[in-house]
């Protein structure tokens, strides 16, 4: 299923030097976002920086949202993860997409112009309406949490 999402190019290198975000394979869930920086950026150990992607989107459909997620290789191999862990893009947001990058490793990391640094995934949204109750109906789990089911 393909849903049209409005995209605005904010950096002219997108679509010329670097491709528009796209799915790498038919089974891909996310589209790569690139670091649209002007020069190589070294992220020091423990440092967090905000990186422009060169695009803005408008999801518009209130039944959808977008999430910005880390790329697994950057986190596992280099310790580069998202500073906010997950970026949530509401359907009515129309501003630039930025990626908060946190270097949780002990080594500096050089981010190059156009590097793929995160992925954009669209997800369905359900807006809940709370129903106040005095007690919950019982369940097998009850209030058990934080490892209550064990590790094996």
Curated annotation (Swiss-Prot):
Q: Which reaction does it catalyse?
A: dUTP + H2O = dUMP + diphosphate + H(+)
Which species is the source of this protein? Shewanella baltica (strain OS155 / ATCC BAA-1091)
GO terms classed as biological process? dUMP biosynthetic process; dUTP catabolic process
Protein EC: 3.6.1.23
**SUPFAM superfamilies, per the entry:** dUTPase-like (SSF51283)
Source organism phylogeny: Bacteria, Pseudomonadati, Pseudomonadota, Gammaproteobacteria, Alteromonadales
Question: Which coenzymes or cofactors are required?
Answer: Mg(2+)
Tell me the function of this protein: This enzyme is involved in nucleotide metabolism: it produces dUMP, the immediate precursor of thymidine nucleotides and it decreases the intracellular concentration of dUTP so that uracil cannot be incorporated into DNA.
Major enzyme class: hydrolase
Q: Which GO terms describe its molecular function?
A: dUTP diphosphatase activity; magnesium ion binding
Q: Which UniProt keywords apply?
A: Hydrolase, Magnesium, Metal-binding, Nucleotide metabolism
Judging by the UniProt lineage, the source's domain of life is: Bacteria
Q: What name does UniProt use for this protein?
A: Deoxyuridine 5'-triphosphate nucleotidohydrolase
Q: Which family does it belong to?
A: Belongs to the dUTPase family.
- Biological pathway: Pyrimidine metabolism; dUMP biosynthesis; dUMP from dCTP (dUTP route): step 2/2
Which amino acids does the record list as binding substrate? 71-73, 84, 88-90, 98
Q: Which cysteines are joined by disulfide bonds?
A: none
């Amino acid at each position: 299923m393909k849903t049209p999402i409005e995209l605005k190019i904010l950096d002219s290198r997108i679509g010329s030097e670097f491709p528009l975000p796209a799915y790498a394979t038919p089974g891909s869930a996310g589209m790569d976002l690139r670091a649209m920086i002007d020069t190589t950026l070294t992220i020091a150990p423990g440092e967090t920086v905000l990186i422009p992607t060169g695009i803005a989107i408008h999801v518009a459909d209130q039944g959808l949202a977008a999430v910005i997620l880390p790329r697994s290789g950057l986190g596992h191999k280099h310790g580069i993860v998202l500073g906010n862990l997950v970026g949530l893009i509401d359907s009515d947001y129309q501003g630039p997409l930025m990626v908060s990058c946190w270097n949780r490793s002990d080594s500096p990391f050089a981010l190059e112009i156009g590097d793929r640094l995160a992925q954009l995934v669209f997800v369905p949204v359900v807006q809940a309406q709370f129903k106040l109750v005095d007690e919950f109906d019982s369940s097998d789990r009850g209030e058990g949490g934080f490892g209550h089911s064990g590790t094996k």
